Each structure stands twice: as C-alpha cells, then as structure tokens.
Amino acid sequence: MHTLIERLEKVTNSKELEEVRLNALGKKGVFADKFNQLKNLNGEEKNAFAKEIHHYKQAFEKAFEWKKKAILELELEERLKKEKIDVSLFNAIKTSSSHPLNYTKNKIIEFFTPLGYKLEIGSLVEDDFHNFSALNLPPYHPARDMQDTFYFKDHKLLRTHTSPVQIHTMQEQTPPIKMICLGETFRRDYDLTHTPMFHQIEGLVVDQKGNIRFTHLKGVIEDFLHYFFGGVKLRWRSSFFPFTEPSAEVDISCVFCKQEGCRVCSHTGWLEVLGCGMVNNAVFEAIGYENVSGFAFGMGIERLAMLTCQINDLRSFFETDLRVLESF
C-alpha cells in the first residue's frame, strides 16, 4: 500500500491520476482486495489488520485530494498559457460578404446616380390617393382588394409598390425631375416567388413636353440591363400599366440556359425583368402638371438578385439559413 502513495506522487496529469485512483479505490482495486482478506482472519488479528487498512486508505484519500487539486491548478495554468491572446498580433478574422439584396441595391445606385438620378426615400405607410388614385388605378382595380393589400383601420395602408414616391416627388418638386426610389413594398402573398415584403426600384424622368421620348427610355433601360447582366439579348413587348401609356415589358435572354430552354424560363429562352413606359397624362393631371412628358420604369430587386445569384426560392433571402447566406 506504500507503493500507491509513491505512485501518486509521480502523477503529472488527470489521466494518470484517474488510473491510480481506480487501481486503489476501484471495485477491483488494492483496498477492495485487502478488505476481502479480512474474512480469512479472526479476533485481534482481524481488528488490527482492519485498522491498518483504514489508516492507509484515509492517508491515500487525503494524498489523492491534495494531488488532484495540484494537478487541476497545473492543467488550468497550462491551458491559460495556450489560450492567451496577444492583442497586438494580427488576427485573420473571417469577414462576411454583402447580402445579395444589398449588393443588388448598391449596383443599381452606382449605375443611375452618375447619370443625374437623385435617390428619393418615401414612407412605407401611404394613403389611397398616393398609392392608387394618383396612379390612375380606379376604385374597382383588383390591387385595392383587401386580399392583396395590407390596410389599417384609419384607411391607411402599407404601400404595394414604390410608385407613391414618384407622386410625392412631383408634388414637392418641379420639372425637370430625374429620380429613383428603392425600398420595401408589401402585398399579401407568400410562395416560392412572392413574399409579404419585397423590394422594388422605380425610376422617373419628367421634363417639358417634347423633351422626353420613348427612345430616351429605351436607351436608359438597355444600357442598364447590359451593365447589370452583361452581354444578354433584350426583347421588348407591348404591355399595359394604368400609370404609363404606351407601356412595355422587357425580357432578357435566359442567364441559366443561354436560350436553349430550361425550367426557369419555361423553355422559352426569355426571362421577364421589368416594366416601363411613358407616364400617363392622367397621372400628370392628378398632380396638376401641364405641358410635360416623362417616362417611368420599375423592377423587383429580389428578381434581379435571384437571376444574378441563381436562386430559385425567393424566401431564401429572408430566412436565417447560414448554409444559404454563406454561399454568396
């Protein structure tokens, strides 16, 4: 039993300490074996041997606790030395990249601001006039339905597009006007390609009548799309929007299949990216403008980001899935 304490004194780490403990105090350890030997003894010899075992067991346990404390302090000191941080040294901290939506917004702003477009910011809460009536959306238009629009009790609503900013800008300023607006919009929809909150960018140019033509609009849009997507093909289609006349939609050649046909472009080879047109005179009349002309355009920022990042589910932009966010 003397050898147990001698062995304990030579221990240098927790693993060795546990091995010595089990060898001494375990079910099959030295002291358990000694206690089993008592059954073979009688009388005073048994009592004397039992006292001797208890004496050495208590001595071992006391030495063990002292050694355990010393080992733990030593290991803590070594661990602290290893984990010591020298704040004067450079540490290669992992930095995150820009979120796809922020990257897309910044890229849009970088194109339009050098051309003289002023960035306007509008309210997220609007009234019926600025969100619908001034934009030539009649009372029976389906966009006014409560199934599509978030209404408040005081007849206010969450804007369904960024177009109200155009109305506010024209009310507060006089031509010539060149502006863009980027921001959140809200509609009651949620699926692979729609979310209750999404982002739009709209542009407006207004000047004296005759100074702004459709060819100006066409030039701006084509320059922007080639800047944003590179060497894609463009297709213009006539369309209808209450606030523009004439109106058009613009498609780009599919960035996924290069017009060979795929599920994303419904095997047509084309992807719709934006709507535009010359501002309807009814909009100017609602504002009180006379003898002016202008063009407007609008597009979904998520739509642009989905195409550039090749993301199929719009909801991925707003969910906190690090596997998705770290892939950008």
UniProtKB/Swiss-Prot annotation:
GO molecular function: ATP binding; magnesium ion binding; phenylalanine-tRNA ligase activity; tRNA binding
GO cellular component: cytoplasm
Keyword tags: Aminoacyl-tRNA synthetase, ATP-binding, Cytoplasm, Ligase, Magnesium, Metal-binding, Nucleotide-binding, Protein biosynthesis
Cofactor(s), names only, from the UniProt record: Mg(2+)
Signal peptide: none
Source superkingdom: Bacteria
Keyword Ligase (UniProt): yes
Substrates-to-products reaction catalysed: tRNA(Phe) + L-phenylalanine + ATP = L-phenylalanyl-tRNA(Phe) + AMP + diphosphate + H(+)
Localization per record: Cytoplasm
Sites where the protein binds Mg(2+): 245
Cofactor note: Binds 2 magnesium ions per tetramer.
Keyword Aminoacyl-tRNA synthetase: yes
EC number(s) from the headed UniProt entry: 6.1.1.20
Gene Ontology biological process: phenylalanyl-tRNA aminoacylation
Top-level enzyme category: ligase
Subunit structure: Tetramer of two alpha and two beta subunits.
Similarity-based family: Belongs to the class-II aminoacyl-tRNA synthetase family. Phe-tRNA synthetase alpha subunit type 1 subfamily.
Protein name: Phenylalanine--tRNA ligase alpha subunit
Species annotation: Helicobacter pylori (strain G27)
Lineage of the organism: Bacteria, Pseudomonadati, Campylobacterota, Epsilonproteobacteria, Campylobacterales
